[in-house]
């Protein structure tokens, strides 16, 4: 879509034209389900000369919540590398302004859990600008059955919609009515 969302048609029966628009037939019309996926992660914006990665956000990921978070860098070649997001000058004992620094995408970076010390070392791994960075959602299911996770607010709905699409594909079933799925990249607004 124009706003970056994804509209998927799952097939199904043909939605019939409704003659009287004031009384749409719920039995014959198409169905649209939606979920938002506004907090997606980041991409590598730069492989720095010291082997660390500068980021650019995808969606509404605030830099101040990412400090010390574990992450995965997914290359376009299918390799996955782990790392940690940290402040550029992360030493509390050396950085006298540690507590005053506003965390933003200009002063946080990814330190890879690999033996790298230069941009060349990182590029040998296949990591480059545009590769995806996925942050650990820190998911936990409590004894009482609650699910706690970062970025959960509507990812669960997105997972349910994708699970339904997978179910239809794997079983070969076709819905009786036309079914659309819409994944928005904005908070509940499409």
Label each region the model flagged:
Residues 1-190:
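N-terminal hydrophobic/helix-forming segments and targeting peptides
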